[in-house]
């Protein structure tokens, strides 16, 4: 009996994000936005960092999926690598920096009131207030 010819496996990458924004430090892509939670992918380019910031109405859980970085939470700085997880409580002062030579990629889950206006920038390399 003749065996069916197997087709080579092909995969097409599709953009599944519902919102996205390019920033001076990289890019964020939003994949879920439901009442009480939101899920994003954050891409931090080499040599860049997010503003030192805090949120009044949401906490965040980050999972590092690629690259490495320096994570600041309040007065503590920690090196993070793929597989590491960090929790940012409501009002926790935080930032992430990519000192490496490849993109730092984070999956971020926000819990609470997930509004882009809920950001207080305490320091910003790009002059944003």
Residues of each region from the PLM?
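Short acidic-glycine-tyrosine-enriched beta hairpin
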Residues: 75-93
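A short glycine-rich, His/Asp/Glu-containing loop-to-beta-strand
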Residues: 15-54, 58, 109
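Short beta-strand His + acidic residue motifs that chelate non-heme Fe in jelly-roll/DSBH
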Residues: 51-53, 71-72, 88, 94-100, ...
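Double-stranded beta-helix
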Residues: 2, 6, 10-23, 95-129
């Amino acid at each position: 009996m003749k065996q069916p010819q197997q087709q080579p496996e092909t995969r097409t990458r599709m953009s599944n994000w519902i919102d996205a924004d390019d920033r001076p430090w990289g890019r964020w892509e939003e994949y879920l936005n439901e009442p009480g939670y939101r899920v994003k992918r954050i891409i931090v380019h080499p040599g860049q960092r997010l503003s030192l910031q805090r949120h009044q109405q949401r906490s965040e859980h980050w999972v590092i999926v690629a690259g490495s970085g320096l994570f600041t939470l309040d007065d503590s700085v920690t090196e993070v690598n793929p597989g590491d997880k960090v929790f940012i409580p409501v009002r926790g002062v935080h930032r992430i920096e990519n000192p490496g030579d490849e993109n730092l990629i984070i999956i971020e889950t926000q819990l609470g009131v997930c509004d882009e206006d809920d950001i207080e920038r305490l320091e910003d390399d790009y002059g944003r207030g």
